[in-house]
């Protein structure tokens, strides 16, 4: 919902969708991995009720508070919380520049998934069976920054660590259109 713009402005980077993604009424929890604009997307967050439960890294807290959200739970890597019948464990994620979060999420029957959007696998995670891994499967580089998504590099390690039934690809671009200097 709404364009994605990275500071300092649209001339630098802008992502747009032709069709808005509708937000379902029955969503009762939000899980944020990072406080960056493409993860903690203000136009999308404005569509939610202010009392929705949000699990996030510290980098997202100030943004969420400014938007008026009232049920914010900050998790640091290795911390766990039980929420809405789920056990949510934060794992160390991408250093952009501070360490952000990945998550292991399991229901009461032990079914669940692992997610980390930049292809960083926390070396402290012990091998375990998990149903699905949500991860990029490609590497992405930025001029003057270098590799910031390491999906192709981490995928074999994720499969070895979690032995997932499913790998769900993220960070592929989808139907988005990108403009700006960063996209050149």
For each predicted feature, which ranges?
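Short, polar loop motifs at secondary-structure junctions
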Residues: 1, 57-63, 76-79, 119-121
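Pre-active-site segment of Zn-dependent metallo-hydrolases
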Residues: 1-31, 43-47, 120-128
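Active-site metal-binding loops of divalent metal-dependent hydrolases
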Residues: 1-5, 34-35, 93-94, 117-120, ...
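Divalent metal-coordination and catalytic microenvironments
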Residues: 34, 41, 88, 118, ...
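Short active-site oxyanion
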Residues: 48-54, 112-113
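Cap/insert and terminal regions of metallo-dependent hydrolase folds
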Residues: 53, 59-62, 122-184
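Helix-loop-beta element that forms the nucleotide-linked donor phosphate-binding surface
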Residues: 64-74
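Catalytic core of the metallo-beta-lactamase
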Residues: 82-134, 149-154
């Amino acid at each position: 919902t709404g364009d994605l713009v990275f500071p300092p402005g649209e001339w630098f980077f802008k992502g747009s969708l032709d069709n808005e993604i509708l937000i379902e009424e029955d969503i009762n929890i939000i899980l944020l991995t990072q406080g960056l604009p493409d993860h903690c997307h203000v136009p999308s967050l404005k569509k939610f009720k202010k009392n929705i439960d949000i699990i996030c890294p510290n980098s997202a807290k100030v943004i969420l508070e400014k938007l008026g959200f009232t049920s914010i739970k900050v998790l640091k890597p290795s911390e766990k919380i039980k929420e809405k019948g789920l056990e949510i464990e934060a794992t160390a994620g991408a250093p952009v520049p501070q360490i952000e979060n990945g998550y292991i999420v399991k229901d009461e029957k032990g079914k669940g998934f692992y997610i980390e959007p930049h292809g960083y696998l926390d070396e402290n995670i012990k091998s375990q069976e998990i149903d699905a891994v949500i991860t990029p499967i490609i590497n992405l580089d930025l001029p003057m920054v270098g590799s910031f998504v390491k999906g192709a590099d981490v995928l074999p390690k994720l499969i070895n660590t979690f032995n997932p039934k499913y790998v769900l690809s993220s960070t592929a671009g989808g139907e988005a259109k990108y403009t700006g200097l960063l996209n050149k």
